[in-house]
């Protein structure tokens, strides 16, 4: 299947690539089906792309690329909702706010997107750990999360 994206042209994807968000995402509750694709020539950022609205693509990254000790503690209810059986089924992404000044590019460490890669379902959650910033600068000299 093909999808025309706003910023990255045509993306090929398969049915098995679709991630279902039962409740959508905050601000996009009406959107339920997404794919994640890598940005060419960039090994940090990916895009969480809506299949229902081609103009909606959210930059994301793995928090572990900038914060090796990042920790997500899911509640029993979240584990149940996402049908998680093991850590190996979990993919964690964080949204990114892009800025023309690279020093101002931030990620939201407080509200990760949790994806069960086996069941292809996802949910954005809010962590209780207030040490994780909502606007954490990605490109800083010291990465202390």
UniProtKB/Swiss-Prot annotation:
Keywords: Bacterial flagellum biogenesis, Chaperone, Cytoplasm, Translation regulation. One of its GO terms (biological process) is bacterial-type flagellum assembly. It is found in: Cytoplasm. InterPro entries: Flagellar_assembly_factor_FliW, Flagellar_assmbl_FliW_dom_sf. Pfam families: FliW (PF02623). Interacts with translational regulator CsrA and flagellin(s). Belongs to the FliW family. NCBIfam families: PRK13285.1-1. Acts as an anti-CsrA protein, binds CsrA and prevents it from repressing translation of its target genes, one of which is flagellin. Binds to flagellin and participates in the assembly of the flagellum. This is Flagellar assembly factor FliW. The gene is fliW.
